[in-house]
UniProtKB/Swiss-Prot annotation:
Induction: Down-regulated when cells are exposed to an acid environment. Up-regulated when cells are exposed to high pH.
Membrane topology of the entry: Peripheral membrane protein
Organism: Dictyostelium discoideum (Social amoeba)
Protein's cellular compartments: Cytoplasmic vesicle membrane; Endosome membrane; Contractile vacuole membrane
Protein name: V-type proton ATPase subunit B
Keywords: Cytoplasmic vesicle, Endosome, Hydrogen ion transport, Ion transport, Membrane, Transport, Vacuole
Family designation: Belongs to the ATPase alpha/beta chains family.
Task of the protein: Vacuolar ATPase is responsible for acidifying a variety of intracellular compartments in eukaryotic cells. The B subunit is non-catalytic but combines with other subunits to form the catalytic complex. V-ATPase is responsible for energizing electrophoretic K(+)/2H(+) antiport by generating a transmembrane voltage of more than 200 mV.
Coiled coil: none
Subunit record text: V-ATPase is a heteromultimeric enzyme composed of a peripheral catalytic V1 complex (main components: subunits A, B, C, D, E, and F) attached to an integral membrane V0 proton pore complex (main component: the proteolipid protein).
Tagged with keyword Hydrolase: no
InterPro entries listed in its UniProt record: ATP-synt_VA_C, ATPase_a/bsu_AS, ATPase_F1/V1/A1_a/bsu_N, ATPase_F1/V1/A1_a/bsu_nucl-bd, ATPase_V1-cplx_bsu, P-loop_NTPase, V-ATPase_su_B/beta
The keyword Zinc-finger is annotated on this UniProt entry: no
One protein family per Pfam: ATP-synt_ab_N
Length: 493
């Protein structure tokens, strides 16, 4: 008998049984939140499976713990949950995302489940959607340019690999079309047939997350990616407007977890686009209101700055890893108000902004990017001889200066009339018109590489005599001013 007991102990000593407890203690449902009572040992961020009376299962996450009381946010919404028939099972684990290189070319909903009629992704790893904290000392400064094929971005507001730079838009502006165009055309700069870094053509991937978009917009993105052939290198996460609002809180984190795996394990250069961050912030406000927290500015929670930083700061590069994450969040400013808390806090965290202008859009110019309030703080590390071309910085500075002067002359013309303008003033007006129509404006499917964009910039700067180009050195003027421009207004690639 003793030997039998020893045998049983030997074959079971390596097994630990943690029975999952099933509760029927729902005490209240408040918006997207479910309050449970008499819970034994709940854990913060623990995943909870709620089984409704009809057998339907929904996932939730522990948001707050007060003794034996737990507040759970339900990702699929709380409609149909009642106190009598709902069973809640605590998993003892946090929310993890199954990740694999096979995620590319797939379409997921806002909860990370495939919706493209394909099989579930065969997971190579399960990663915490909150990401791993990155030691600041091992971060690598962003360098080398991400080429979007859009002249106003590539030439005037160059994006460095590993940068986070938002697009500030507003309702009714073509930010969705711009996002789709960036996905179609984005890549690293190719120079004279040789890449800046090895194998970057094959190692470039895109993770696209849409939050709170309508069915028409979701269909547009899916159709555009499939028709352009960029779907094979894209992982698409779609949270529709009729999906539960609470789901929008985890959608960007699922997308970024996938991006981190592709960047740091598969060593790909990943471009992450998140639209619309305003929908995300509204979902955050809804949860905060349901928890009866003290509201901050315009009803948004006081911790929104910290929460947004947990998303934006997941971009970057790490020592010892060849991959990188470049992030372009897109947000719509309510009432075109750049002082609204969402763009205001986003601007503090990110490294610049690209500004979509309604007045330029009203003049039928696409993409309606206003370069004056736009800024890329890391542009200096993304351009130059080794990465784009030696004249890039000077051309950008000179076009900025001439465009700003042209705007001043345009305002003066409205007051004093064209007759009072000097011949030099008229040159700036001519440059202003050509800059907006020919340089900023381009076709939806026109992919200009950085070298064509710089040549096009020179063709505009030749409007002026060389002595007026005061932000360009004599050496650069001798090299580029007299030669014919390769970039043309009607060129399409």
């Amino acid at each position: 008998m003793v030997g039998f007991e020893d045998h049983i102990a030997a074959i079971t000593r390596n097994y630990q049984v943690n029975p999952r407890l099933d509760y029927r203690t729902v005490t209240a449902v408040n918006g997207p939140l479910v309050i449970l009572d008499n819970i034994r040992g709940p854990k913060f961020s623990e995943i909870v499976t709620l089984t409704l009376g009809d057998g339907t299962q929904r996932k939730g996450q522990v948001l707050e713990i007060q003794g034996k009381r737990a507040v759970v946010q339900v990702f699929e919404g709380t409609i149909g949950i009642d106190a009598k028939h709902t069973r809640c099972e605590f998993s003892g684990d946090i929310l993890k995302m199954p990740v694999s290189e096979d995620s590319l070319g797939r379409i997921f909903n806002g909860s990370g489940k495939p919706v493209d009629k394909g099989p579930n992704v065969l997971a190579e790893e399960y990663l915490d959607i909150q990401g791993q904290p990155i030691n600041p000392s091992v971060r690598v400064y962003p360098q080398e340019m991400i080429q979007t094929g859009i002249s106003a971005i590539d030439t005037m507001n160059s994006i460095a690999r590993g940068q986070k730079i938002p697009i500030f838009s507003a309702a009714g502006l073509p930010h969705n079309e711009i996002a789709a165009q960036i996905c179609r055309q984005a890549g690293l700069v190719k120079k004279s047939g040789k890449g800046v870094i090895d194998d970057h053509e094959d190692n470039f991937a895109i993770v696209f997350a849409a939050m709170g978009v309508n069915m028409e917009t979701a269909s547009f993105f899916k159709r555009d990616f499939e028709e352009s052939g960029s779907m094979d290198r894209t992982a698409l996460f779609l949270n529709l407007a009729d999906h539960p609002t609470i789901e929008r809180i985890i959608t960007p984190r699922l997308a970024l977890t996938t991006a981190e795996y592709l960047a740091y394990q598969c060593e790909k250069h990943v471009l992450v686009l998140l639209t619309d961050m305003s929908s995300y912030a509204d979902a955050l406000r809804e949860v905060s209101a349901a928890r009866e927290e003290v509201p901050g500015r315009r009803g948004y929670p006081g911790y929104m700055y910290t929460d947004l930083s947990t998303i934006y700061e997941r971009a970057g590069r790490i020592q010892g890893r060849n991959g990188s994450i470049t992030q372009i969040p897109i947000l719509t400013m309510p009432n075109d108000d750049i002082t609204h808390p969402i763009p205001d806090l986003t601007g503090y965290i990110t490294e610049g902004q690209i500004f979509i202008d309604r007045q330029i859009n009203n003049r039928q110019i696409y993409p309606p990017i206003n370069v004056l309030p736009s800024l890329s703080r890391l542009m200096k590390s993304a351009i130059g001889d080794d990465m784009t071309r030696g004249d890039h910085s000077e051309v950008s500075n000179q076009m900025y200066a001439n465009y700003a002067i042209g705007k001043d002359v345009q305002a003066m013309k409205a007051v004093v009339g064209e007759e009072a303008l000097s011949s030099e003033d008229k040159l700036y007006l001519e440059f202003l018109e050509r800059f907006e129509s020919s340089f900023v404006g381009q076709n939806h499917y026109e992919n200009r590489d950085i070298f064509n964009s710089l040549d096009l910039g020179w063709s505009l700067l030749r409007t002026f005599p060389s002595n007026l180009l005061k932000r360009i050195t004599e050496k650069t003027i001798k090299q580029y001013y007299s030669r014919s421009s390769k970039g043309t207004v009607d060129s399409t690639n």
